[in-house]
């Protein structure tokens, strides 16, 4: 599954519901990737976990910015 990189500008343009849905999907993807790795296999793309974690961080950062 190819995932587009979300930039902060794109995230800010999303509605709160869209951000929550995207965050949920990213966390599920991260869980899936970590499960593959823990079962002894290696991820087809080693940088994928790092990319997913960064996207989650971007989403959470924008969420916290909007709370201020």
Curated annotation (Swiss-Prot):
PROSITE patterns: RIBOSOMAL_L29 (PS00579). GO terms for biological process: translation. Keywords: Ribonucleoprotein, Ribosomal protein. InterPro entries: Ribosomal_uL29 (IPR001854), Ribosomal_uL29_CS (IPR018254), Ribosomal_uL29_sf (IPR036049). GO terms for molecular function: structural constituent of ribosome. One of its GO terms (cellular component) is ribonucleoprotein complex. CDD domains: Ribosomal_L29_HIP. It holds the Pfam family Ribosomal_L29. SUPFAM superfamilies: Ribosomal protein L29 (L29p). Belongs to the universal ribosomal protein uL29 family. This is Large ribosomal subunit protein uL29. The lineage of its organism: Archaea, Methanobacteriati, Thermoplasmatota, Thermoplasmata, Thermoplasmatales.
